[in-house]
Amino acid sequence: VLLLAAFYGGARRGTSLQLVSVLGYLFSFLVAVANYQALAKKIELYVPYMSVTADSKLVFYNLDLALDLDKAYYAAVAFIMILFAGWLVTKLICIFANGLRFKRLRFLKGYDWVVAGILNTLLVYLNIYFFFMILSMIPLATIQNLFDKSSTAHFIVESSPIISDYFYRLWITNVIG
């Protein structure tokens, strides 16, 4: 339902305005990649994280990795914070560029709305992935049981094309080692 609403929202915006949003998101993404580790070290005192114990059972991570998972959690939260700040700036820019909503790209002919809908759906899917990925790092039995029982959430975290491997490397491998 969320992805259908995302497609509809993007289709209404049109490709011109949606491209402004995508480019802003891409720029924010690059800034986040460059700066998330420095911010992660600073937010440890302000963002809570439950300690992993020997009894903790995580769906996606073994115990050896889970004992250092707090570092990856802070890295992911820092990344999302930077991305969110960039998203707010992008939304502000989109308010001023709202006239692009009615400008259709000629080379797309009648498919302008489809391209815009797909672009917005991809952005929303990426945000859903971020949400589930951060949840997967929290060693709370209730949350881990949801991942264990939900094949959709499990698929999004573990099998999303391209992004699952990329963010595992970015947040887990690069941070924990």
Where are the predicted features?
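Alpha-helical transmembrane segments and their juxtamembrane interface "caps"
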Residues: V1-G177
